[in-house]
Regions:
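A charged N-terminal "starter" segment
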Residues: 1-109, 115-128, 152, 167, ...
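A short small-residue
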Residues: 6-13, 178-182, 216-223
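Active-site-proximal loop/turn and secondary-structure-junction residues that shape catalytic pockets
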Residues: 48-52, 73-74, 94-96, 114-116, ...
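Short acidic, glycine/serine/threonine-rich loops at helix termini
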Residues: 57, 80, 100-102, 122-125, ...
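Non-cysteine beta-strand/loop elements that form the S-adenosyl-L-methionine
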Residues: 70-73, 91-94, 127-145, 177-181, ...
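Active-site glycine- and acidic-residue-rich loops that bind
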Residues: 108-120, 151-163, 185-198, 230, ...
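Phosphate/diphosphate-binding glycine-rich loops and adjacent basic-rich segments that engage nucleotide
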Residues: 132-159, 166
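C-terminal active-site-proximal or functional interface alpha/beta core segments in diverse enzymes
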Residues: 188-270
Length: 270
């Protein structure tokens, strides 16, 4: 997108005007999928809280992306944009059981991040497929304000509560199909991310009917010239190898999920 293009668009549509570069979004999406091309099953859930413009959602849908939603309003917007319920993940924080029930009734995958709701939902709906969000207590984001995997974070069930979590799952006989984590935004050190991934793998070993592992996102993009960014290619190389190795140990090809938001869209806006 060149300055002259922006001037022409402003003259055509008037100003102020929001312009998004579809080619940039597409190149970022392809960069991520290429980095993990050695993984048999890869799914991208666009974190729509980054930019929920319906035209952007439709663009990503046509590329093959799915969605990560944090509220029932985002779920409804995703459905409006043409996504099917099975293409949407619901990852709320601090919402009521009633809202989770309402979203689940739509056929959307539920991701639960606290023990109280997990027990209540599992008791009422033991056969409904559920993903569990854990907190690995690893701070991989740029600072504590945008890191959500550290010990004081409100996001996710602490790994120190794993025995309690397992008791709930055993007592309710609920159907756990996925394990999820999200360490934070602006990840610089991929070794820290890989360390958190090992914690996720260890937790996953406790569940025998998993279908996917969700590693969140938080990939840093450059905000200015020569700014540092997450080395997606190196992360793809290392995590793909370890993920494939884990699947072999687990005895099943699981789906690897990422939920990028600003990685896909933050460099595309004008």
């Amino acid at each position: 997108m060149q300055p002259k293009d922006l001037v022409q668009l402003a003259e055509q549509f008037g100003s102020p005007l929001y312009v998004y570069d579809a080619a940039k979004i597409q190149s970022q999406y392809q960069r991520l999928t290429k980095a993990f091309s050695k993984v048999e099953k890869l799914r991208i859930n666009y974190a729509m809280k980054a930019l929920s413009n319906v035209a952007i959602l439709e663009l990503l849908r046509d590329m093959g992306s799915c969605l990560d939603a944090v509220s029932i309003q985002e779920v409804q917007l995703g459905l409006h944009a043409g996504y099917s319920p099975d293409q949407i993940f619901f990852t709320p924080n601090g919402v009521s059981l009633e809202e989770i029930e309402e979203v689940s009734a739509l056929g959307v995958q539920i991701n639960i991040d606290n023990l109280s709701i997990l027990e209540q939902f599992g008791t009422k709906y033991p056969t409904v497929p559920v993903c569990i969000r854990i907190n690995p207590h690893v701070m991989a984001g740029g600072n504590t304000n945008i890191s959500v995997g550290h010990i004081d974070s409100k996001f996710g069930i602490s790994i120190h509560q794993l025995p309690h979590l397992l008791r709930i799952v055993e007592n309710t006989k609920m159907h756990i199909v996925g394990i999820h984590m999200h360490t934070g935004s602006d990840i610089l050190d991929i070794e820290v991310f890989l360390y958190a991934a090992e914690i996720l793998f260890d937790v996953a070993k406790n569940f025998k009917e998993l279908e996917f592992l969700d590693f969140g996102s938080g990939f840093k993009v450059p905000y200015k010239k020569d700014d540092i960014e997450t080395d997606i290619e190196e992360l793809g190389k290392k995590l793909s190898k370890r993920f494939n190795s884990f699947c072999a140990e687990y005895g099943k090809d699981l789906t690897l999920i990422f939920e990028p938001g600003k990685f896909l869209v933050s460099e595309a806006g004008y």
